[in-house]
Each structure stands twice: as structure tokens, then as C-alpha cells.
């Protein structure tokens, strides 16, 4: 379900699948061929959410932002933190993604949490159940695990190739629902 917030309405690219029960609210942009699965909540109410192409947001995931602040004259005082997710990303079931940046070709495992102002570099894996704390930054090709999450090692080329394939698998899954 697409829900207007004030003057902002979600903007979906071509061939995007939004499953029954999913709620996409306000200033949310979703790239072509992406999918938002059952009972997800994407709240672009007090800042924006941008999701790239061929990205899948799996069941029960919540994505939110940190609010912008304005001066009395309406000018921007603090930009807050939007949530920006790259292309070919897989966000596993029941994750919380809050006011952060996730690069392209990233896999975020089930039940992971990524907090405000954190950044995950391209071609990385955040393991299931990991908690990436506020402001933590990880370089490209990172294997990120734990609570609090730590850099374990650099990913191999074979592991990086899997990340793109994982996202492409979900493009096929969502196409089955659109047919």
C-alpha cells in the first residue's frame, strides 16, 4: 500500500513488486525491478528513503529515517539522516534499517539492525542478527558480523559474485508474482 505523507507520495520505478501488507509511506523512491515483500514498512515521513534497482526488501523489514530540522523561517537547519540503499541489494527478513547508507551489491542477513549514520560499503555482507551501531562505517568487500558488528575480513571474489546473483534471484521471484 502506498501512503501519502503531507505532500510526499512514494515513487516506484518500472516493474516494482509491492507485496500485500507492505506499507510504503511518504518520500520513498524505489528503483526499477526492485521488490518490497510481505508486511514491510518503509517510512519516508520525516526524511527520504532511496532504494536502487533490482533491490529486494524481504518480509517484515522496517526502514525508517532520522528527521530533518528547520529554522523558524523554513530554511534547513539540520539535514538529519535519510536512508539510501544501492542497486542489487538483498535485505533479509525482519531487519531494521534506520537512517543509514548501504552500498550496492550488499547482503544484509535476517534480523540484522543497521543504525543511524552507519555506512556499509559496496560488495559487503552483514551477517544475520548483527547490529551495526550508530555512526559505524565499513569499507567495500567487508564481512561484518556480531553485536556490536565488527569487520571480520575482506570478501573473496567468489563471495562478491554471489551478492549480485542473490539480488537477481529475487528479481525472478518477484516476476513470478507479477505474472
Which role fits each region the language model picked out?
Residues 2-11, 15, 19, 70-96, ...:
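C-terminal segments of enzyme domains that contribute to small-molecule binding surfaces
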Residues 14, 19-20, 25-26, 31-32, ...:
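Left-handed beta-helix
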Amino acid at each position: 500500500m502506498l501512503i501519502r505523507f503531507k505532500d510526499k507520495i512514494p515513487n516506484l520505478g518500472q516493474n516494482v513488486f509491492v507485496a500485500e501488507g507492505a506499507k510504503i509511506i511518504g518520500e520513498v523512491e524505489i528503483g526499477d525491478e526492485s521488490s518490497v515483500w510481505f508486511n514491510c514498512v518503509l517510512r519516508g515521513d520525516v526524511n527520504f528513503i532511496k532504494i536502487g534497482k533490482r533491490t529486494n526488501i524481504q518480509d517484515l523489514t522496517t526502514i525508517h529515517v532520522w528527521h530533518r530540522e528547520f529554522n523558524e523561517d523554513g530554511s534547513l537547519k539540520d539535514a538529519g539522516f535519510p536512508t539510501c540503499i544501492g542497486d542489487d541489494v538483498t535485505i533479509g527478513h525482519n531487519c531494521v534499517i534506520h537512517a543509514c547508507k548501504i552500498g550496492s551489491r550488499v547482503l544484509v542477513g535476517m534480523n540484522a539492525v543497521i543504525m543511524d549514520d552507519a555506512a556499509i560499503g559496496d560488495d559487503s555482507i552483514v551477517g544475520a542478527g548483527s547490529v551495526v551501531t550508530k555512526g559505524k562505517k565499513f569499507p567495500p568487500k567487508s564481512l561484518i558480523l556480531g553485536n556490536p558488528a565488527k569487520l571480520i575480513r575482506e570478501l573473496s571474489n567468489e563471495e562478491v559474485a554471489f551478492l549480485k546473483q542473490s539480488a537477481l534471484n529475487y528479481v525472478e521471484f518477484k516476476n513470478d508474482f507479477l505474472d
